């Protein structure tokens, strides 16, 4: 990986998620230059103009431009938000056929322009497509990151905060596994304002049913939002901006992303949601949480669900 001096990001895909991410990135002043690529060039021109007008009020000046794949050569991060959007009633895994070919075309174009930074993937199903980007790019897996369960974990923290009247920043709780229907909460290591949820469950067994309901609302939130407004955008846009900030500023912060496993949780050769330490080089290391037997059972089911789909496109070597 060559030494990339600047803080340039290339965003591929300026739909609802991409534009929300661009707005968050510009508003936070994270990068020097944001180049945006999209097939709808007229709409892209309008978004670039609109974002540049807002830079006046941002914390620092970010150059926003209509990009081409040539911009990837000196980019620190390429963020992929392109692909078919999830429709009402459609699961994320059902998107895979539509989006796999799109990923192949995008990665081929990026790599043809000597990109040597970090890939950040948000297109769904994100775990499967992050694996695809890794395979198609030929990069070391540490340099390919998926948004994973960063949004799911944020939703869970928000909903727990509403339940306990505590700021989400004072809640430490992860959703892991597939970014989708088989994900799971890790209540055994969760804390609310420093208080162990495991201990609370031991004191009050009836609390488990309430927490499971909160988790189900978390898991199904995307369906509710899509049914109401057509797509999710702001939450994932801000989550992607957070991951980008961790990369650009070499923060060594643990975030729940889609990371490649090499034996952690007993799993190999799969991208799946788990906490991982993020820095300028990508994923520094995967954080393997200590799971209860029941949590591990659910995690294995989630991994097997992803692997079943993954192997249709990338059969395991004999």
UniProtKB/Swiss-Prot annotation:
Binding residues for beta-D-fructose 1,6-bisphosphate: 157, 172
Naming one, the record's GO cellular component terms include:
cytoplasm
InterPro entries given for it?
L-lactate/malate_DH, L-lactate_DH, L-lactate_DH_AS, Lactate/malate_DH_C, Lactate/malate_DH_N, Lactate_DH/Glyco_Ohase_4_C, NAD(P)-bd_dom_sf
GO MF terms listed in the record are: L-lactate dehydrogenase activity
Question: What EC number(s) are associated with this protein in UniProt?
Answer: 1.1.1.27
Q: In which pathway does it act?
A: Fermentation; pyruvate fermentation to lactate; (S)-lactate from pyruvate: step 1/1
Name-wise, this protein is: L-lactate dehydrogenase
Species classification: Bacteria, Bacillati, Actinomycetota, Actinomycetes, Mycobacteriales
Gene this chain is encoded by: ldh
